[in-house]
Amino acid sequence: MSYGKKLTNAELIAFLNANRHGILAFAGRTPYALPMGYIYREKTLLLCLTDEGKKMERLKKNKTVCYTICKTRWETEGLKTPCTSAVIEGKLEAVKDKSVYGLGAKKFENMTLYKLAIAEMGARKCIRKPCELFANKSGATVKARGKKKG
């Protein structure tokens, strides 16, 4: 049984524009992933990375990455919006001309702007109503933590 429905292209673009963070995972002998903000412009994901650390060591060896964006029911009022996610695979490439993306000549100290050259992308949303995966024994859906009405 499938729990997800593929997003239309319009839904995918709206999802990418509505969110600003995800998890960037690097290829390698051992797993390495970190939370990372992004900007979606001109059918491209843009990421700004510091020029040092483990991610740069990984990137020098292999530019292939996977970026996952997820919005869960827990993040919405009354658990009403379906869980939605996008998984994007490709290679990170340094952006030489930032003006192409309307970013001007901004320069961040010890940081480089990268674009994710998308090789493959998939996006789905949950079709369960309400989310049966988080229902308690009585069948009632568990309320979102930290959310107060009114």
Language-model features, listed with the residues they occupy:
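C-terminal edge-of-domain segments
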Residues: K98-G150
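A short, sequence-level motif marking secondary-structure junctions
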Residues: G37-R41, K91-A94, P130
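Extreme N-terminal tail/first-helix region
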Residues: M1-A18, F134-A135, T141
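Short, conserved, surface-exposed binding loops centered on an aromatic residue
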Residues: A14-L16, G37-I39, E57-L59
